[in-house]
């Protein structure tokens, strides 16, 4: 299934350190040649300051067990540079108690005043803290790096030349330390900055494309991520436009989120429209499964695609944890769609559509009825399932209306903002003639 693997293209939009978990994940699969994959990891890790990881990769490639002279020298240089940077920030390193106390850092002005008064803080110390945070990150010491990056965010002005780099670095470090709550906060902060910054159209598109890829890592690991990925990718026009323009392969992750999110079935209609629009640029078993089911009503095709979906998800680092949930919810979607067409269904027919044995299918339906997720009755003698009516709840109708209005409002706001910028530009240009 290498033809459906997105690792290569996803890594193009990720920081070098964020690619390592994806590459290590692939090492446990049989998609690519193991030797070539390890050689690529070694080539990539050589561009960082993670000497121990470099040596470990060399051992896995059956290279020399002893550290080469070049690496010995590099390790000494890394340690020397690290010590020098730590000496430069020594005046604020004494403030580690404040760094650990989040409450005292919420008010930026108060915090800076305290640093200046108690620790003789100067502006040049901020540049040193930034350099140390970046160097610690390059060494793979992500946890310690986050402390200094947080310090920089509190003290720095948003107009500082390094502010955007700090936002990206903080998000990457929190992802790599699996701090998903903080990572989500950093993701939101970075998105707000990108959306409000005075970037050119191309720069904004590039920034959003990178953010989209990084956010997938957060959304599929945070409890609220399944709702947030739908809101951001499907109902924020600027990000939907970035996906359609730069990275239509992200449709895989949006589609997966909708399938496994039973409370957002109202998003299916909008998702299907986008999938159809982008079908000429990107297709995979997950998007094709939804097309088979909701566009063509091809249940046999959906059944076959669901089987392919399992292989795709099993080999995708971003969504592998969703495999069982995806299969369960996809079967439910097949069942619900089939039931809208046929009010009375034989269990054997249903089992065939769901890739299940008849007794497994019957137990599965019984559990659905028992858990109040299905209005139906089973006639065991005839082997039939008789469906009842399933009206859309007022809550679902309200959510659908709100999503629709939200998307339209954001689209109109974007049009007004672009028109305003154009008028301002024309006004400024007119002064050139006087």
Swiss-Prot record:
Key words, A-Z: Cytoplasm, Initiation factor, Protein biosynthesis
| A Gene Ontology term for the protein's cellular component | eukaryotic 43S preinitiation complex
Location in the cell: Cytoplasm
* PCI domain boundaries: 219-392
Q: Which GO terms describe its molecular function?
A: translation initiation factor activity
Q: Which terms under GO biological process does the entry name?
A: formation of cytoplasmic translation initiation complex
Q: Which InterPro entries match?
A: eIF3e, eIF3e_N, PCI_dom, WH_DNA-bd_sf
Task: State one Pfam family annotation.
Answer: PCI
- Report the family membership: Belongs to the eIF-3 subunit E family.
**What task does this protein carry out?**
Component of the eukaryotic translation initiation factor 3 (eIF-3) complex, which is involved in protein synthesis of a specialized repertoire of mRNAs and, together with other initiation factors, stimulates binding of mRNA and methionyl-tRNAi to the 40S ribosome. The eIF-3 complex specifically targets and initiates translation of a subset of mRNAs involved in cell proliferation.
Assembly and partners are described as: Component of the eukaryotic translation initiation factor 3 (eIF-3) complex. The eIF-3 complex interacts with pix. Interacts with mxt.
- Protein name (Swiss-Prot/TrEMBL): Eukaryotic translation initiation factor 3 subunit E
What is the native source organism of this protein?
A: Drosophila pseudoobscura pseudoobscura
Specify the taxonomic lineage.
Answer: Eukaryota, Metazoa, Ecdysozoa, Arthropoda, Hexapoda
